Swiss-Prot record:
<keyword id="KW-0694">RNA-binding</keyword>
<keyword id="KW-0699">rRNA-binding</keyword>
<dbReference type="InterPro" id="IPR001790">
    <property type="entry name" value="Ribosomal_uL10"/>
</dbReference>
<dbReference type="GO" id="GO:0003735">
    <property type="term" value="F:structural constituent of ribosome"/>
</dbReference>
<protein>
    <recommendedName>
        <fullName>Large ribosomal subunit protein uL10</fullName>
    </recommendedName>
</protein>
<dbReference type="GO" id="GO:0070180">
    <property type="term" value="F:large ribosomal subunit rRNA binding"/>
</dbReference>
<comment type="similarity">
    <text>Belongs to the universal ribosomal protein uL10 family.</text>
</comment>
<dbReference type="Pfam" id="PF00466">
    <property type="entry name" value="Ribosomal_L10"/>
</dbReference>
<dbReference type="InterPro" id="IPR022973">
    <property type="entry name" value="Ribosomal_uL10_bac"/>
</dbReference>
<dbReference type="GO" id="GO:0015934">
    <property type="term" value="C:large ribosomal subunit"/>
</dbReference>
<dbReference type="InterPro" id="IPR047865">
    <property type="entry name" value="Ribosomal_uL10_bac_type"/>
</dbReference>
<dbReference type="InterPro" id="IPR043141">
    <property type="entry name" value="Ribosomal_uL10-like_sf"/>
</dbReference>
<dbReference type="InterPro" id="IPR002363">
    <property type="entry name" value="Ribosomal_uL10_CS_bac"/>
</dbReference>
<keyword id="KW-0689">Ribosomal protein</keyword>
<keyword id="KW-0687">Ribonucleoprotein</keyword>
<comment type="subunit">
    <text>Part of the ribosomal stalk of the 50S ribosomal subunit. The N-terminus interacts with L11 and the large rRNA to form the base of the stalk. The C-terminus forms an elongated spine to which L12 dimers bind in a sequential fashion forming a multimeric L10(L12)X complex.</text>
</comment>
<dbReference type="GO" id="GO:0006412">
    <property type="term" value="P:translation"/>
</dbReference>
Amino acid sequence: MGKQPLAKKAEMVDEVRSLLQASQMVLVIDYRGLTVSEMNQLRAELRKADAVCMVVKNTLMRRAVADQKAWAGILPFLSGPTAFIMIRGDIPAALKAYQDFAKQTKKTEFRGAAAEGLSLTLDQAKAIAELPPKEVLMAQVAGSLKSVATRLAVGLNAVPTQVARGIQEIPASLARAIRAIADKEAA
């Protein structure tokens, strides 16, 4: 009988580890005061942004991140009742979903976030949330690259044209200079 709870805890740690490995960012929130229906509502909103909200005991989360440096940023936020929002997909969309939920219910408290081994504050997470979606950023980068390529092509195309104009201008300039010298000597 004593091994059964340990086996469940080990299974839970493994599940959390696999979710963390698939995640890009983790938000840590205090969920005190949320009803079951509100928690289910939050989970449903987060699912749309490819994020998962889990309530995990802090000791189990410590075990799950113990050997993963990428998630060491979570450790400072592990105190009291804690829920973890593991974002696998669109980070700005998931952060916005959480922020909208928090504004609506006024019952959750954002403790912090972690990504790439760093701890993030609310302001840092909000700055990320205000970024355009991934597809828009990719389109902007592609547009910038296309613009650079176009400018380069136009510039390279202009060089031979300008060289040709310069070559054509040499005889005309030489003729004007000779005419000016002749006019000066005649005067």
